[in-house]
C-alpha cells in the first residue's frame, strides 16, 4: 500500500498517532517528496482542530510543536516549488499563526505559485480568493471551473489526503462539476 492510501485510512479511522508516525517516517525516508511534506503539514495542522482531540492535550501539543519545524524544513527545500508554495499557502490561511507567518504572507505564497504557473487552474484560486471569508462570484466561478476540469481534479486527487480534503470543501460549491 502506498503511503497516501495508508495515510487516508489512518485519518479516516482517526488514528492520529499512527498518521503522525507514518508521515515522520515518509519524510525521513523520502525527503524529496513535496506531497509528503504537504500532507504532513496538513495533518499537523488538522489534528489539533479535530473535535475529538483535546486542543490542550498531548496530541494537539505535539502536532503544534512539530508543525513549524516541518514547515521550515520543507520551505528550505521547496521555496521555489510552485506546488509547495500553493499548498503550504492554502494550508497556512487556516491557521497562519501555527506557521509563524501572517495571513498576507500565506496569500502571497499562493500568489507566487500562480505567477510561476499561471496555466495551473487550481493556482488561479490565488487570484480570486477573498480572505475575508466571504465568497464572491469570481471565487465561486473559479471553484466550479476547477471542479469541471478533469485534469485539475486529477491533479488535486493525486496530492493525497490534503487533496481529498480540498475536493471535499469544493464540492458544495458545484452542482454540475466533477465529483
Give the residues covered by each predicted segment.
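Helix-boundary capping/turn motifs
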Residues: 11-16, 63, 80, 119
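Alpha-helical segment of the N-proximal tetratricopeptide repeat
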Residues: 2-18
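Alpha-helical repeat scaffolds
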Residues: 20-26, 54-77, 101-114, 137-153
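Acidic, low-complexity intrinsically disordered regions
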Residues: 12, 83-86, 151
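Extreme N-terminal leader/anchor segments
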Residues: 178-179
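Amphipathic alpha-helical repeat scaffolds of TPR domains
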Residues: 1-5, 30-54, 79-96, 119-134, ...
